[in-house]
Amino acid sequence: MLSTGLYEDFPTLKMKINGKRIVYLDSAATTLKPKQVVKKLEEFYYNSYANVHRAVHTLAVRATTEFEETREEFAEFLGASPEEIIFTSGTTMAINLAVVSLLRSGILKEDDLVLVSLLEHHANFVPWLRLSKFHGYRIDFIRPSGRFGTLEMDDLLKHRDKNPKVVAITGLSNVTGQRIPVEELRNVFPNSIILLDGAQLIPHEPVKPKEIGVDFLAFSLHKMLGPTGVGVLYGKREVLEQMEPFLYGGEMIDRVSLEDVTFNELPYKFEAGTPNIADIVASREALRYLKETGFDSVHEKIEQLTQMALKEMMKIGGVEIYGPLDERQHGIVSFNVKGIHPHDVAHILDQEFGIAVRSGHHCAQPLMSILKEQSQIDFPNSTCRASFYIYNTEEDVKILVEGVKKVKEWFSR
């Protein structure tokens, strides 16, 4: 069971779905929010809200101070400098910012090679693919060769001699839960710009981009107890200084004349317009909550629940589970029940058992195609996905397993 304190921090856990207590297993999509985050949001709006970086009155100074202190806390968390922390609306915006700015600045040029893995969420796939049509750079794909979309080291090594300009890869698959060996990326691609999609990885462990040698790291706060509409892009200072801004407008400029524009210093030249001030400030409470809980404890708990779910789900006949099915699989269990569409499975789990899981292609259609190739069932180009976080328990896993068994029984009558 949850500790009383943790249970009280997440009021959503007290909900009932058709008389059943909610079992929230959709944290890979978005996490529940603790009371501390919501309280901070309310307090800031009532006591400190004003626009930032624009005025000298008391509220503006107070808001700007909290805003920049939040940036400093995220910089410390990532082992970076505040100038390397850019606030965005989420991982999708962060990645698009990096892609477009690399192109505008001429760092990524025609005939350069971009490597993208086939594990990617569309946010780290579509921008690279689509913009290659307009800018003439070449694109190649890192194809996973292991069990149901598992990326092996050899899959990376076979591309090392291609000298890619950019390597874009996730740190943890949002479909299979495979944790990629991000610590090895710089060794494999010593001269490449590496962009790491950390949307699923950072909520589970505090990766330090400088230590592992990546140039960009993108993630979203709503997947780690924070508000929606807040993302972080870490960018290596030496690269950011060369890059043209993604958006133009207020506060990202130094001087504007009739002839040209000069830009503000880092990180502000990448933060045009009024930012999502209150949600960014409240996101600091989410980070603090996780730090106080302890990321080692967060990681260990999620790992235990994942391995328990894998072990028990593998005992159910007619259930196909995707991913490596070993210690590399973390936080996510994607599966299908033979002969039953995942949308039907998810709907029944919700209505009959109070279980919230995701069903669909999870914004990863290229990976779905790979799963279909290896599937032993009539693969529906989608899966059910159960994902775990700090507020889940072993009892939640047991309810999920029993729910899947019941769904299978009902459809076999």
From Swiss-Prot:
Keywords in alphabetical order = Pyridoxal phosphate, Transferase
Q: Main EC class of this protein?
A: transferase
Q: Keyword check for Transferase, yes or no.
A: yes
Gene3D superfamilies linked: Aspartate Aminotransferase, domain 1, Type I PLP-dependent aspartate aminotransferase-like (Major domain)
A Pfam family (short name) is Aminotran_5
Q: Which cofactor does it need?
A: pyridoxal 5'-phosphate
Record-level Gene Ontology MF annotations: cysteine desulfurase activity; pyridoxal phosphate binding
The stretch of residues making up the signal peptide is: none
Residues forming coiled coils: none
Q: What is this protein called?
A: Probable cysteine desulfurase
Q: Species name for this entry?
A: Thermotoga maritima (strain ATCC 43589 / DSM 3109 / JCM 10099 / NBRC 100826 / MSB8)
- Taxonomic lineage of the native organism: Bacteria, Thermotogati, Thermotogota, Thermotogae, Thermotogales
